[in-house]
Amino acid sequence: MIKDESKFWREFKEDTPEISWTRIENSVSLGTPDLLGYNNNGYFFTVELKVAKSNKVRLSPHQIAFHVRHPMSTFILVKDVKNSRLCMYVGRQVKDLLACGLSLVVGIFGI
């Protein structure tokens, strides 16, 4: 899955040149999202990248805890391989995402 997420990151970075991205190495702090973004409106936010080959989205307990503690300005972006789509959820949806998987209504539209 690591190779899939690395490829997803490269594609995502190319498709979002208007955002300044910093890739975060997670060996320092477990659960910290993969990306720190900064947009043209002057806002920082984090994104956890996931590649799902089924309805289930796999998140570690540390990743879940991060989004529970930081429900705002945090996102989980899932590449749904089976249905060829991107699904973005806001951090506060993390528990629902675990319970419902990709059948959960997407939290952000237009990506």
Question: For each predicted feature, which ranges?
Answer:
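Beta-rich catalytic cores
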Residues: 31
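Structural signal for conserved beta-strand scaffold positions within catalytic alpha/beta enzyme cores
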Residues: 23, 48, 76-78
